[in-house]
């Protein structure tokens, strides 16, 4: 008798995706982050659901409702901090996942890569709207500053901003709609993850060498399920440690002050995971130029498959491009640091240099180094 997991219409899909999936035998721990992102998404949806049961999306009570969750709800403080720090873990895994994709040439699977970029944009939008919900000072002013950027769009900018706000400033209507979108988007993300996996399993996983691995594949279960479970334990341990020992480490103290439209914080900045993009935005003196640079800082990932000039897929055997890659990583860390600094000399200049270098590495240095390597290895 054939096993039910191979015949049942529903189990068959799960079996082909997580059990009998042919997987390259040499994929490293850098391939763990896909499953870790899945765990992060589940944690965020569950904790978010419990928070939504007690949260009120009204400007007069939003801040108090978050205080109420932390003080009066059973383990409310734990749920709240799991959700807030879970977002940070989500972005750490996300950045490593994208970084691994760039390093090992996974972007040559164009459909999977493009769905991934859309997912990245959607997750960033969700996180931004979630940051507005506690209605602290940084929530309010962050929402005001970031939504105001849309006013840089010619002709329709101001109308568009007022339409998003639901009035002439960030107010009750804005908070209510942000809560509605913040609630629904994770489920849309979950659906898009299915599409991402669908495209991935169409061609199969890449591997560290970047070579065709059809001759050497092993079933996903038990080999990679065990490997993923280890990663999940490490992730949960890190998250729990962060929540229990330093819950406010990655937050902003200004967000413990209720939102006040009459008092601007001395330094408005988003959460740490947006700082690199925020630094790129600030480094362009022109408003519209800054907005375009901000969007391009993520959208530039979509042109990677078209800038791909090497005969070798992975950077494993390409030391020159490896150098450019790690230069890019260092540059993103510098941008993250600059995004959290005040707008004054020398931070402005460092930000402008780092932003220019960011785009230059991706568009100019990496493709050129690939051509040089091909020439040196006589690959042409």
Swiss-Prot record:
GO biological process per UniProt: mitochondrial electron transport, ubiquinol to cytochrome c
Residues reported in the UniProt entry to bind a ubiquinone: 201
Named cofactor requirement(s): heme b
Molecular function (Gene Ontology), one example: ubiquinol-cytochrome-c reductase activity
Protein keywords: Electron transport, Heme, Iron, Membrane, Metal-binding, Mitochondrion, Mitochondrion inner membrane, Respiratory chain, Transmembrane, Transmembrane helix, Transport, Ubiquinone
Pfam families the record matches: Cytochrom_B_C, Cytochrome_B
Other information: Heme 1 (or BL or b562) is low-potential and absorbs at about 562 nm, and heme 2 (or BH or b566) is high-potential and absorbs at about 566 nm.
PANTHER family hit by this protein: CYTOCHROME B
Protein name as catalogued: Cytochrome b
């Amino acid at each position: 008798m054939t096993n039910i997991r191979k015949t049942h219409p529903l189990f068959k899909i799960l079996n082909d995706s997580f059990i009998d999936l042919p997987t390259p035998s040499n994929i490293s721990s850098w391939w763990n982050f896909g499953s870790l992102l899945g765990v992060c998404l589940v944690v965020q949806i569950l904790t978010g659901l419990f928070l939504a049961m007690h949260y009120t999306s009204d400007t007069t009570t939003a801040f108090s409702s978050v205080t109420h969750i932390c003080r009066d709800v059973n383990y409310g403080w734990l749920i709240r901090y799991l959700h807030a720090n879970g977002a940070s873990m989500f972005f750490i895994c996300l950045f490593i996942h994208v970084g691994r994709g760039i390093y090992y040439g996974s972007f040559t699977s164009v459909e999977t890569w493009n769905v991934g970029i859309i997912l990245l944009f959607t997750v960033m939008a969700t996180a931004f709207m979630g940051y507005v919900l506690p209605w602290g000072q940084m929530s309010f002013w962050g929402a005001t500053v970031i939504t105001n950027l849309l006013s840089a769009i010619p002709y329709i900018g101001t109308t568009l901003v007022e339409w998003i706000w639901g009035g002439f400033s960030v107010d009750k209507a804005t908070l209510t709609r942000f809560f509605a979108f913040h609630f629904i988007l994770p489920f849309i993300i979950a659906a898009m993850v299915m599409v991402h996996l669908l495209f991935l399993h169409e061609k199969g996983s890449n591997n560290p060498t970047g070579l065709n691995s059809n001759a050497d594949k092993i079933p996903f279960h038990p080999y990679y399920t065990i490997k993923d479970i280890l990663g999940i334990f490490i992730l949960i341990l890190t998250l729990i440690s962060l929540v229990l020992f330093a819950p406010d480490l990655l937050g902003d103290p200004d967000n413990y002050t209720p939102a006040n439209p009459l008092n601007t914080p001395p330094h408005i900045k988003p959460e740490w995971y947006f700082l690199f993009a925020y630094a790129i935005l600030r480094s362009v003196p022109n408003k519209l130029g800054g907005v375009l640079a901000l969007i391009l800082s993520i959208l530039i990932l979509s042109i990677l498959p078209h800038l791909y000039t090497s005969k070798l897929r992975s950077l494993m055997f390409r030391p020159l491009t490896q150098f450019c890659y790690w230069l890019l990583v260092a540059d993103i860390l510098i941008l993250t640091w600059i995004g959290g600094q005040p707008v004054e000399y020398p931070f402005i200049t460092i930000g402008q240099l780092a932003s220019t270098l960011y785009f230059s590495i991706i568009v100019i240095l990496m493709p050129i180094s690939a051509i040089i390597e091909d020439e040196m290895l006589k690959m042409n």
